[in-house]
Amino acid sequence: MQAAQGVKDASGLYEVERRAYHAARPGFRIAELQISPTQKVPWHYHNNVQDTFYVLKGNLRLFLRDPKEEVRLGPGDTYSVKPRRPHLVTNGGDDSATFLVLQGIGEYDFVPLV
């Protein structure tokens, strides 16, 4: 997969119940997101950074490509997605899900898949 031009701030591309940044510095950041049962982080990938998900409350479902995979996470579970691996994040339960996503090391971008 060739590097595609991504956006530096994806907050306007999809809706969440709550978004907060706990750490942000060049090459690394930690965001906390809360999504309702009907919300999702759409299909995308990152050219340079790895996403590491840590579930605080509720359940997440991650769908991945290259290779195709589905991962279910509950409170205390973690999962890392390597750079350039397309993924979609959905709520895997009936209540809101809250999770941390650690992103780095490298320049952040968000490349949406059409």
Go through the PLM ranges and name each one.
Residues 1-31, 42-43, 112-114:
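A short, N-terminal "cap"/entry segment at the start of jelly-roll beta-barrel domains
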Residues 67-83:
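Short acidic-glycine-tyrosine-enriched beta hairpin
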Residues 75, 83-109:
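Ligand-binding loop in jelly-roll beta-barrel domains
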Residues 34-36, 46-62, 102-104:
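Short, conserved beta-strand element in jelly-roll/cupin
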Residues 22-29, 38-54, 66-67:
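A short beta-loop-beta micro-motif enriched in histidine and acidic residues
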Residues 26-28, 36-39, 59-61, 68, ...:
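Short, charged/polar surface micro-motifs in flexible loops or helix N-caps
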